[in-house]
Amino acid sequence: MAGSTKDIDALIELMARLPGLGPRSARRAVLHLIRKRALLLTPLADLMGQVAATARECLNCGNVGTSDICDICTDERRATGELCVVEDVADLWAMERSGVFKGRYHVLGGTLSALDGVGPDELRIPRLADRVTAEAISEVILALNATIDGQTTAHYIADQLGGRVRLTSLAQGVPIGGELDYLDDGTISAAMRARKEL
């Protein structure tokens, strides 16, 4: 081989640690970046340096941005009485893409998990209780994943906040375009329990 590829190999190895990329996909991505150095690699490296220097968690809700308090928390047009609780930032961003929620968010940073040793103090649950009181929240919407840990977390939060605020959760069941034959028993069961009048 004409020259050392140590740095390129290290980049491939690092890229392979990203979600959704294995060693083969990482190698293809790195080779593509190198081929498109001026168009992709150089601007990407510059932006990654900027993000590494400025990215931080919002001190209020846990969103990711470039200031101590994120744009959502400082947006005065947002409904201040509604707080949507999500597991992580990716869930917050998914809710924002839908455009249906106009309130504020609270990112837990995960779910309770006895197997993984994650308790309430490892998450932002105590901060959630503080926000409900300090911000005069009237409704907490639990938008947690329909997993065992997600449901355990939802029940724990309901126990902690019960009686202090209206608690709701996202409906669960048959997705738009979904066919019953392809759904698991738990999804069909949840859909039956959440049925509504037409």
UniProtKB/Swiss-Prot annotation:
Pfam families: RecR_C, RecR_HhH, RecR_ZnF, Toprim_4. InterPro entries: DNA_Rcmb_RecR, Rcmb_RecR, Rcmb_RecR_Znf, TOPRIM_dom, TOPRIM_RecR. Coiled coil: none annotated. It comes from the Bacteria. GO terms for biological process: DNA recombination; DNA repair. Residues 81-175 form the Toprim domain. A zinc finger (C4-type) spans 58-73. Keywords: DNA damage, DNA recombination, DNA repair, Metal-binding, Zinc, Zinc-finger. May play a role in DNA repair. It seems to be involved in an RecBC-independent recombinational process of DNA repair. It may act with RecF and RecO. Belongs to the RecR family. This is Recombination protein RecR. The lineage of its organism: Bacteria, Pseudomonadati, Pseudomonadota, Alphaproteobacteria, Rhodobacterales.
